[in-house]
């Protein structure tokens, strides 16, 4: 057992660098600053600020310059970090068991045998407008709810945090999940180039950089067939898990390699031909797809060889009237509407959400003594929530690959670790590999990227065996990157 101190609190950040520089660590304008002198009478007319909530865990009696610190955040966009905090590498862990829906409360919170505190201090940060954090002032939502605005807020938060706790000279890591990986690509670049904070390692979990690879809505973008090719190995893993294949291979990983080769070869070729594909080739590819993902040949031909995530989730276990999960395809639940073409809800989200939110609310008040009389928002209030996907002034589909590439070029020692689940259809693992292997960097720099896959879903840590692997592999990554930087 590792002795640690837990601190829950908030730090206030500004919505521009100029304004942020004039805010003290208490979040108030520094006396005599331009900001203090021009303070409006009404708080709603003041420049926007975000009070960001965090929980930090520090190992007792550790030397700051020798002790790594890792900043964690979930995605959404619009999500608090309750999921990573209560499920992954923090000192406490929500017991969720297997791939089944949990019964209602009481739920069980236990000490986490796989906490990362053995190698790093941990900071779990809630994005602006979630958790116990609040955004306020003029145009507050526009000032924080967007790709660039959000990354800037996190960079300002981290700069303030390492000032408050004297951690400028500690090895630093950022750990984002899902949209949090999108944030990390932008954030690593902003920290390095705007705040002079070099990061030792970027740890990505369930990555999405390029939003045109999304398998949820590929039909909106005809002619872009990449999403189908990158999701195919996840379809195959899912069919394998649910034993829906005509011939069931014994081992998963060699089977997935075979599917990847097919996906980038004969499958990609047939899709690229569009309406020029011959009947013979189409029939052959449909037959092979049937062998790999278990859906009927006639269904695959009707779908023109292109099956969206929602269609796959609805169709794979249709004979049992079950809908397959999206975030974790090992989960299944009763279909809401048997005649629906696509899945109408996600069995995994509905299976575990209540346990996480209930236990966090209990833990933060009883153990951390924080939040009395306040409401904890697991997500931004979605009635008013709108996210601005414009990045660097570019309104077309979001792709943050250039940001990470730039961070790696300007800090060639930066190491990147990509983690993902074979059973994740929200951000398929093969898409993450494809994105990383297409970063505009040299082959030498690409050696700084490593991949780690797990027999789990989007939140790989809900499966105990995967959580243990995640801990061991992330711990090894932190050790190795420190050895490299000495």
Residue ranges with predicted function:
Residues 270-426:
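Alpha/beta-hydrolase fold catalytic core
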Residues 176-189:
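Glycine-rich nucleophile elbow surrounding the catalytic serine of serine-hydrolase chemistry
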Residues 425-448:
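Active-site-adjacent alpha-helix of alpha/beta-hydrolase-fold enzymes
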Residues 152-170:
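Conserved acidic catalytic loop of the alpha/beta-hydrolase fold
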Residues 90-97, 188-293:
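A catalytic-pocket lid/entrance helix-loop region that shapes and gates access to the active site
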Residues 167-179:
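Alpha/beta-hydrolase fold nucleophile elbow
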Residues 455-466:
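Catalytic histidine-centered segment of alpha/beta-hydrolase-like enzymes
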Residues 19-145, 437:
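N-terminal cap/lid subdomain of alpha/beta-hydrolase-fold enzymes
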